[in-house]
Design a protein with these regions (language model features):
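Catalytic cores of nucleic-acid ligases and guanylyltransferases
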Residues: 1-314
Length: 314
């Protein structure tokens, strides 16, 4: 491929919704960020960490089914829906977490995906990331024709109304974007802001408890800058099925250790089995009071991430 993959522009977290005619608002989909690259010869897909996903999401590689562009880079979110028709990080991770390509055909029948495109960065041999967002969106609607796998993320002008809809449907949140903003490659600034309906964290599993021989809760932690693992709470509810709990119980057998991996002593440590802290999970929570554990944590999905990158935000 003749186009070098880029690190995408990121929104900053915010607890307020901006107002003014220069702002637009979009749903924040609970999926995985994927950029599509077409250099005129081949299509390749990469995530925000520059890991290739071309063979994981083959439905998105038929570029001529939705654009006549000679070359293009698109930015969007790959999502999968749960049984109630809502975007589910747990579901999409069943696809994004595939490590054996020979399983893709089977799993793609079980977990259909959609590509929610929200930006265009490169077109017909020219970088257009310096164009204002308003102009990029106009171009995006001109060159991309939605189909069964491809959608363009809708735009709303009233952020407060959209956030109320998000809360009613239990969605992740909204993204607020300034229409005059450039697309800052490998950048992050307040021209794009994300306002979440709930909070989440990627945490490290440092121990488990069992019920009837099957793991029923995880002890979670985050590292500090000195690479010490701090206990942040227990989680035993969420989106994992019983089958996934059983599979997890078998998988952690080689990770059992005698010593506590956390620098601080967890509460309720009776009958805990400590683990070598190398597995990570995405956890949603309502609140994290200072000096206390996560409030109402809920396990969403296992995530492939370097545990040492799971850091406490100072």
């Amino acid at each position: 491929m003749n186009i070098k993959p880029i690190i995408p522009f990121e929104p900053v977290a915010s607890d307020r919704i901006p107002d003014g005619s220069e702002w637009i608002f979009q749903i924040k989909w609970d999926g995985v960020r994927v950029l599509s690259y077409f250099d005129g010869q081949e299509v390749r897909l990469f995530n925000r960490k520059l890991n290739e996903r071309t063979r994981i999401f083959p439905e998105l590689t038929n570029i001529k089914s939705f654009t006549n562009a000679e070359s293009i880079i698109l930015d969007g979110e790959v999502i999968a829906l749960d049984s109630e028709g809502n975007p589910s990080f747990h579901e999409v991770m069943k696809r994004d977490g595939i490590r054996r390509v020979d399983r893709v055909d089977k799993v793609k029948q079980e977990v259909p995906i959609s590509y929610m495109i929200f930006d265009i960065i490169y077109l017909d041999g020219n970088w257009i990331h310096d164009y204002p967002l308003e102009k990029r969106l106009k171009i995006l609607h001109e060159v991309v024709q939605p189909n069964i796998f491809i959608q363009i993320v809708p735009i709303e002008k009233d952020g407060e109304v959209l956030f109320e809809v998000v809360k009613q449907h239990g969605l992740e949140g909204i993204v607020c974007k300034n229409l005059q903003s450039k697309y800052e490659i490998d950048g992050k600034n307040s021209n794009w802001m994300k306002v979440k309906n709930y909070r989440d964290v990627i945490a490290v599993i440092g121990g488990v408890t069992y019920r009837n021989g099957i793991v029923n809760s995880m002890l979670l932690g985050l590292y500090d800058k000195n690479e010490q693992l701090h206990f942040i709470g227990h989680a035993g509810t969420g989106k994992l099925t019983r089958e996934e709990w059983v599979t997890f119980t078998r998988a952690i057998e080689p990770l059992r250790i005698d010593g506590r991996p956390f620098v601080n002593k967890p509460d309720r440590i009776k009958d805990v089995q400590w683990l070598n802290p190398i597995l990570t999970v995405k956890v949603q929570f309502i609140e994290w009071p200072k000096g206390h554990s996560l409030r109402q944590p809920s396990i969403q999905a296992f995530v492939q991430l370097d545990p040492k990158s799971c850091l406490i935000q100072e």
